[in-house]
Amino acid sequence: ILGNTISLNLIIGIGLSIICLLFLDPILRFFGASDQTLIYAHEYMVIILLGNVVSHMYFGMNALLRAASKPKQAMFATIFTVVMNVILDALFILVFKWGIQGAAIATILSQLMALMWQIKLFRNKNELLHFKKGIYRLKRKLVDNILAIGISPFLMNVCACIIVIFINNQLVRFGGDLSVGAYGIANGIAMVFVMFVFGVNQGMQPIAGYNYGAQKLDRLIRVLNLSIIAATAIMVTGWLIAMFLSYYCARMFTTDKQLIDLGIKAIRVVMFCFPVIGFQMVITNFFQCIGKVKISIFLSLSRQLLILLPLLAFLPMIWDIDGVWYSMPISDFSAAVIAGVVMVWYMN
């Protein structure tokens, strides 16, 4: 598994980098970059894509650490990467004045440092998973199993990319570049709390999978309930910050008064249904953990493609730019309801 995971990450990382670098400007245009923002997006993405293999290897190794019952090491790698990214951002942007390129370099370097530490861990021959000869040749059965388990989160990320493309294009169409900037602020704040829930889900995966396989259903339900409580607490905290501290959140990103005002509205609207979306994320992850891939995929698609995409197309025709904003919390609430209904149906 270790060898096949490394090989797949190398192949996919290199392949995606080559394809994206060859067609970078059209891809950025497709994602909603305007004449004013294209040059900055290009500068940033060239560096990110050149270091894409590092990112693939880092995330792959972290997943393997969790699977090998090393959650503390995986958590350390994640926290180390975030902290180093912040430090290097300040150094490269504020001190060296490298601008957007400095931010990209900081991202790749922080992941590279964590990756070197991960490699050191997997070189220990006393560990269950460790490097050795002959494990890197791809095996069809292993690859099929890896891809089957990973298809749900993969589709979630693909859907998220499609939605971001559509949101950006709708925001440019109905509100201009300022609205795109406001969404960037709101999305940046929202992702802080979403990433915490991702962490809860990642910690839940090996525990839920083991107990389901061992038919210890009481422990399975317990870990599910604890994960829902933790995710909900995280998202309620995010909601409180969005509702009452949105000015300070927007102020961290810009000093432009007009953008701050629009950013405040964007933060409050985008995060309005956060108290219920943590539940939806955990339920989706739960079905992935117990091998119910089709249900997990359906719940992944329901929030983004099946609900949000039609709303983004329809509501702006009624409410103009407000329709773009309101489509997001409506989609979040609807997806949480669907997840609840599916969970009740499955339990019965």
Regions found by a protein language model. Give the residues of each.
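Short alpha-helical transmembrane segments in multi-pass integral membrane proteins
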Residues: I1-G51, V95-G150, A208-C273, F314-N348
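Small-residue-rich hydrophobic transmembrane alpha-helices
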Residues: I1-I18, S55-A74, A182-S246, I277-S296
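Alpha-helical transmembrane segments of multipass membrane proteins
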Residues: I18, P26, G60-L64, V83-L91, ...
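ATP/adenylate-binding site constellation spanning eukaryotic-like Ser/Thr protein kinases
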Residues: L24, F80, A148, V164, ...
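Short runs within selected transmembrane alpha-helices of multi-pass transporters and secretion channels
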Residues: I47-R66, A74-N85, A103-M116, F198-Q202, ...
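Transmembrane helix-bundle signature of multi-pass secondary active exporters and lipid flippases
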Residues: I48-S55, D144-N211, A231-W239, D256, ...
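A hydrophobic transmembrane-helix motif
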Residues: I162, R303-I307
